[in-house]
């Protein structure tokens, strides 16, 4: 966090197949060790599987899944006196998107299916239907914020 000026956000180029910027960002989250072509293969494979299983536009399912995963509020630790409080704060839109993608990838990797495209497709389908690990994570975060609503006057 620089003191002098705000650093401009880098522009992400849209993905080659669908021309979608959000999907390109998601591929960057899936990518490990800079292997973008592998990440593209995984994401496109997962979207093909989603299309096969649901007979719906895979991008619509993807957007719906992200919307169902993205948290509205989260808790941040704030030290007041000798105590540390979990203070609920609203999540800004860019962080909502980033958290949703991060959780989607994390819970896809923890699934039991054989290949990563199958795991990702399964988690996407579950998330679009308000099920699965990533949606449960969002519910847990919301529950924490609700439980600590009393400390919301300790704003940042």
From Swiss-Prot:
Disulfide bonds: none annotated. One of the primary rRNA binding proteins, it binds directly to 16S rRNA where it nucleates assembly of the head domain of the 30S subunit. Is located at the subunit interface close to the decoding center, probably blocks exit of the E-site tRNA. It comes from the Bacteria. Belongs to the universal ribosomal protein uS7 family. GO terms for molecular function: rRNA binding; structural constituent of ribosome; tRNA binding. Gene3D superfamilies: Ribosomal protein S7 domain. The keyword Lyase does not apply. GO terms for biological process: translation. It comes from Teredinibacter turnerae (strain ATCC 39867 / T7901). GO terms for cellular component: small ribosomal subunit. This is Small ribosomal subunit protein uS7. InterPro entries: Ribosomal_uS7, Ribosomal_uS7_bac/org-type, Ribosomal_uS7_CS, Ribosomal_uS7_dom, Ribosomal_uS7_dom_sf. Part of the 30S ribosomal subunit. Contacts proteins S9 and S11. Keywords: Ribonucleoprotein, Ribosomal protein, RNA-binding, rRNA-binding, tRNA-binding. SUPFAM superfamilies: Ribosomal protein S7.
């Amino acid at each position: 966090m620089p003191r002098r000026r705000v650093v401009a956000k880098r522009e992400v180029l849209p993905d080659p197949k669908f021309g979608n910027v959000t999907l390109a960002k998601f591929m960057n989250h899936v990518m490990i060790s800079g292997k973008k072509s592998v990440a593209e293969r995984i994401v496109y494979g997962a979207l093909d599987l989603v299309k096969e299983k649901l007979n719906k536009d895979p991008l619509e399912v993807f957007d719906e899944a992200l919307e169902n995963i993205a948290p509205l509020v989260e808790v941040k630790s704030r030290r007041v006196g000798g105590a540390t409080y979990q203070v609920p704060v609203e999540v800004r839109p860019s962080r909502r998107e980033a958290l949703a993608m991060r959780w989607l990838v994390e819970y896809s990797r923890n699934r039991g299916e054989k290949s990563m495209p199958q795991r990702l497709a399964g988690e996407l389908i579950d998330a679009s239907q308000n099920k699965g690990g990533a949606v449960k994570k969002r519910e847990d975060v919301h529950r924490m914020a609700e439980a600590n609503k009393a400390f919301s006057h300790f704003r940042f």
